[in-house]
């Protein structure tokens, strides 16, 4: 991955990463939009893939990933909401994805899917829906680069944050910190769904370090059409000293 490696979170403050979700971007101007979020200070491009099987919506595929890859230098963070998942992993890796995350319910063999992602040169993430238990991490956390906790039920952008997920964030943070303290690999803790300037501080305090925001970013452009203002406000609010 050519940017942004996992951070242990040690030190005076945890590293904060912002990952605008292009699901909320203007698709008629998608190239301009991804350039604008990078110029505005985004750390990742979050790329939601839905297949109308695992979730009841249909979005974008590898061709779109391939098209935006030359336009940005920041990593592309692909979230696969598809079933079955394994066939698409090589396609997105070839298209330029840097991180690929999937839902355990969409894989017949979770460990094998994690290995497939890593074999194709990408960072591997596991996505847990609001009702999916953290026990999925019992035998996978030491192989992951990213845990993505959904704070809405996946399928559509613009949903409200589910407050009950905060306790799950705290528990996941404790698991990651224990692994790192024991000499294990650092893992990003990403949150996706209803993240906004007025709740990101609370989410960061619970332990998240990587924040997916869709409508909160793309619905609040600067006067010049850029996103420096909202990304700065989100980063400031998420920075816990």
Curated annotation (Swiss-Prot):
Disulphide bridges, residue numbers: none
Keyword S-adenosyl-L-methionine: no
Keyword presence, Transmembrane: no
CDD domains listed in its UniProt record: RPE
Uppermost EC category: isomerase
Cofactor names: a divalent metal cation
Keywords in alphabetical order: Calvin cycle, Carbohydrate metabolism, Isomerase, Metal-binding, Plasmid
Binding site for substrate: 21, 79, 155-158, 192-194, 214-215
Database matches in PROSITE patterns: RIBUL_P_3_EPIMER_1 (PS01085), RIBUL_P_3_EPIMER_2 (PS01086)
Residues forming the catalytic site: 48, 192
Annotated EC: 5.1.3.1
Molecular function GO labels: D-ribulose-phosphate 3-epimerase activity; metal ion binding
Stretches assigned to coiled coil: none
Pathway(s) the chain acts in: Carbohydrate degradation
Any one Pfam family match given in the protein's UniProt record, by short name: Ribul_P_3_epim
Binding of a divalent metal cation, residues: 46, 48, 79, 192
Reactions catalysed according to its record: D-ribulose 5-phosphate = D-xylulose 5-phosphate
Cofactor note: Binds 1 divalent metal cation per subunit.
Known function: Catalyzes the reversible epimerization of D-ribulose 5-phosphate to D-xylulose 5-phosphate.
Family: Belongs to the ribulose-phosphate 3-epimerase family.
Protein's name in the database: Ribulose-phosphate 3-epimerase 2
UniProt organism field: Cupriavidus necator (strain ATCC 17699 / DSM 428 / KCTC 22496 / NCIMB 10442 / H16 / Stanier 337) (Ralstonia eutropha)
